C-alpha cells in the first residue's frame, strides 16, 4: 500500500492483505496521523517505509534514502527524489516480471530511474494551457499558477510515459488530477 491519508474505515479491509506501507511524504493527504497510529497498533506485521522526515514525525520501520534499494520479501523498492515542497520520494519496483513506477506530488520526473516500465502510477495534475490562462489571476482564492507549478502537468506525465514505456501495452494511471485544471 502506498500512503494512508484517508480515514482508517476506508482502508481497513485491505490492511489484512498487505505487508508493506510506503509513506511518500509528510502531507496530511498522504499520511493521516490517526490512521497511521491505528495501523501501527492494530496491524503490527505491516512494516512501514518512509523518508527521514516522515520518520521524525511519525516513526517508520525502514528509513528510505534516494537511490538505495529496500528489499521486502520478494520485492525490491528503489526510492528516488520527487521534488515537492517537502522531502518526497517516488518508488520503482518489480512484481511478476513487470516494472512499476509510482510518483505523485512532484513537479518533475528528472530524478526518476530510467525505464522501461510496464505500469505508471504518476501525477497528472493539470493541463498547462489551462494554467497559462489563469497565470495572473487569483480567481480561485489562491495563486493557482504557483500551486500548479508544484505539481506535474498532464503533458509532462504523458511525455514521461511515452518515452519510458516498455511497449504500447504499458499502463498509465493518472494520479492527483486537479478538479479545476485537468
Spans of features found by a protein language model:
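Conserved beta-strand hairpin/beta-sheet module of binuclear metal-dependent hydrolase folds
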Residues: 1-14, 87-105, 118-119
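Short, hydrophobic beta-strand segments that form beta-sheet elements in well-ordered domains
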Residues: 1-3, 18-21, 44-53, 62-63, ...
Amino acid at each position: 500500500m502506498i500512503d494512508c491519508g484517508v480515514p482508517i474505515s476506508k482502508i481497513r479491509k485491505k490492511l489484512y492483505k498487505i505487508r508493506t506501507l510506503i509513506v511518500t511524504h509528510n502531507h496530511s493527504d498522504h499520511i493521516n496521523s490517526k490512521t497511521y497510529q491505528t495501523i501501527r497498533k492494530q496491524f503490527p506485521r505491516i512494516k512501514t517505509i518512509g523518508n527521514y522526515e516522515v520518520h521524525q514525525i511519525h516513526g517508520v520501520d525502514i528509513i528510505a534514502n534516494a537511490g538505495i534499494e529496500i528489499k521486502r520479501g520478494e520485492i525490491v523498492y528503489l526510492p528516488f527524489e520527487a521534488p515537492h515542497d517537502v522531502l518526497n520520494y517516488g518508488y520503482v519496483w518489480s512484481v511478476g516480471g513487470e516494472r512499476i513506477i509510482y510518483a505523485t506530488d512532484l513537479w518533475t520526473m528528472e530524478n526518476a530511474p530510467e525505464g522501461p516500465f510496464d505500469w505508471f502510477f504518476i501525477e497528472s495534475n493539470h493541463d498547462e494551457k489551462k494554467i497559462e490562462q489563469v497565470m495572473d489571476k487569483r480567481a480561485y482564492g489562491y495563486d493557482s499558477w504557483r500551486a500548479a507549478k508544484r505539481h506535474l502537468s498532464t503533458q509532462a506525465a504523458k511525455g514521461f510515459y511515452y518515452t519510458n514505456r516498455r511497449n504500447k501495452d504499458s499502463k498509465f494511471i493518472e494520479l492527483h488530477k486537479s478538479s479545476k485544471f485537468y
